[in-house]
């Protein structure tokens, strides 16, 4: 399903979205902005929507069923389980302010590499994946309204695609086979040091609501209202 178009006052994330080349649609788990406080003003850089495969609900219910939104939001292990869960995730990052592809890729990968090296996890495979990631972004320039699309497969394949607006193409993208990078990109958004606390709160609230409705008989596919992020 195509996303509604971005306009000057808001970025809209529809209740469902189909990742490029995916067999099915995913539901909107949460959305929020990434920004920073500068001179007493909160400057918004991007709006981020995180979509989850329907299988996420029963998978997360085993451990997190019955938890409130506040309990989920305050527990880093919950977000880690979303990142590493055996279900597909789809992330749409829409620009509010302009940014070059090189700037975006450098910021994402420098944090990943620093963490991996500190944890003794950095290998030649990660080095190759990081270079491929940077090469994908190198020729890109993101004007306000352009989107970066990440599909995170449970097998550890990160697919990167781009859109000139907030729509999602039916196919296309570059696949990077590296589980650590696949998880790290989403971890950088909703992890313990994630860049979008607003998206984390939104995700915790929505998943808590869905888990409360989850039954052993399996509920219908989850639905959500569109989320509008003021730019």
From Swiss-Prot:
GO terms for biological process: flavonoid biosynthetic process. Substrate binds at residues 46, 111, 188. Pericarp. Pathway: Secondary metabolite biosynthesis; flavonoid biosynthesis. It catalyses: a chalcone = a flavanone. Keywords: Flavonoid biosynthesis, Isomerase. The record marks 104 as: Important for catalytic activity. InterPro entries: CFI (IPR044164), Chalcone_isomerase (IPR016087), Chalcone_isomerase_3-sand (IPR016088), Chalcone_isomerase_bundle_sf (IPR016089), Chalcone_isomerase_sf (IPR036298). Pfam families: Chalcone (PF02431). Its EC number is 5.5.1.6. It comes from the Eukaryota. Catalyzes the intramolecular cyclization of bicyclic chalcones into tricyclic (S)-flavanones. Responsible for the isomerization of 4,2',4',6'-tetrahydroxychalcone (also termed chalcone) into naringenin. Belongs to the chalcone isomerase family. This is Chalcone--flavanone isomerase.
């Amino acid at each position: 399903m195509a996303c509604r178009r971005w306009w000057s006052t808001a970025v809209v994330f529809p209740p469902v979205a189909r990742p490029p080349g995916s067999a099915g649609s995913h539901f909107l788990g949460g959305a929020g902005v990434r920004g920073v406080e500068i001179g007493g003003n909160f400057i918004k850089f991007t709006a981020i929507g995180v979509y989850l495969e329907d299988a996420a609900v029963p998978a997360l219910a085993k451990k997190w069923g019955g938890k409130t939104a506040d309990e989920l939001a305050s527990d880093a292990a919950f977000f880690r389980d979303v990142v590493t869960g055996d279900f597909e995730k789809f992330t749409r990052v829409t620009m509010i302010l302009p940014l070059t592809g090189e700037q975006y890729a450098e910021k994402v990968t420098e944090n990943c590499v620093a963490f991996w090296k500190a944890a003794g996890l950095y290998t030649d495979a990660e080095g190759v994946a990081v270079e491929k990631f940077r090469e994908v972004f190198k020729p890109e320039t993101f004007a306000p309204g352009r989107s970066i699309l990440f599909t995170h497969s449970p097998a550890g394949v990160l697919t990167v695609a781009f859109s000139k607006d907030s729509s999602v193409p039916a196919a296309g993208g570059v696949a990077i086979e590296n589980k650590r990078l696949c998880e790290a990109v989403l971890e950088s958004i909703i992890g313990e040091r994630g860049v979008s606390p607003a998206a984390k709160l939104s995700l915790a609230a929505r998943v808590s609501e869905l888990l409360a409705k989850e039954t052993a008989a399996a509920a219908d596919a989850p639905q959500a209202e569109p989320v509008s992020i003021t730019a």
